[in-house]
Amino acid sequence: MGGSPKNKRIRTKQKGKASGVSRAGRRARAAVAAQPRPKMARISDEMKYLCAMLGEEVRTWPGVTSKAMFGMLGYYRSGAVFAALPVTRAIGSANGIIFKMKAMSEAQTDRASRDLRLGTGTNIKADRWHSFEIHSEDDLRDALWWLGQAYESAR
């Protein structure tokens, strides 16, 4: 009563194979997986210090938690990631932080177009992620502003 032999034959036939995926599709997926990952840049001691200062401020915001990820510290609001600050490594530039925004308002888009430190890094493969270059303490105010915008966007 455990099932007919026909059902067993079907289960055996499907075992180990992804249903509906062609051999070419499996080869293409394997080729993508075999590609080397882009190297993450090591950050300087100054950048470690600047990011630690930013991180201290961000952790004081309501509902913010942090979690280590890929040599960076990810910041979350109510379970949604909104930023990542380098601890030992950075994505793209060694001086860059990254943040995620759902959609920029017209005012944010205008401000972003005038700020050469802001961009969508070529090493960031996901939509809505932006990078911000920090070269000195003078850049922290603007970096904090963008992190605040990302925090609000993560509602």
List each model region and its residues.
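Charge-dense, low-complexity intrinsically disordered segments
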Residues: 37, 41-45, 134-137
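Polybasic, lysine-enriched low-complexity intrinsically disordered terminal tails
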Residues: 1-42
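N-terminal first-folded block
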Residues: 41-81
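Generic alpha-helical secondary structure signal
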Residues: 45-52, 106-107, 138-141
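Well-ordered alpha/beta subsegment
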Residues: 123-155
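Short, conserved beta-strand/beta-arch hydrophobic-aromatic motifs that form part
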Residues: 68-127
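Terminal, positively biased "leader/anchor" segments
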Residues: 39-40, 65, 83, 99, ...
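Short, intrinsically disordered, mixed-charge
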Residues: 56, 111-118, 145-153
